[in-house]
């Protein structure tokens, strides 16, 4: 697994073969960031259910102002630290060990411009998205990775799916608040 583009392009990340660890593939990450394009530059990003940290590190590589990595597994938070060190990333991030579903009552200090969630495929992705949806900035975008076979809802607590991308066994749902016509 490697960083696709940006200042850290080509850096290799550690991705152990743990039961339940399912890193976002290089191909799907490349598709995601091609869609997000300039939206990443200067953004505050939440990489939820972060696993290896690959999505958040890719965001740092492409100019995100700050990335918050959240994962409930101690091994994952340690892995994220190692992967950040491998890439010589010294600042511009926070790593939090927490279960997004259970610990979402603690809001962040500032809203996120981009929220990426990759919950375990056996979890209900909408439950995790609901837990952090209010952390999204007014013009922010929530991206949910889920099993293609199970799908994801068209709307989650006031956020509407604006796009879906399918690749292999995975899919990405892009959610935003509806624009108010005025």
Feature roles, as predicted:
Residues 1-182:
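Class I S-adenosyl-L-methionine-dependent methyltransferase catalytic core
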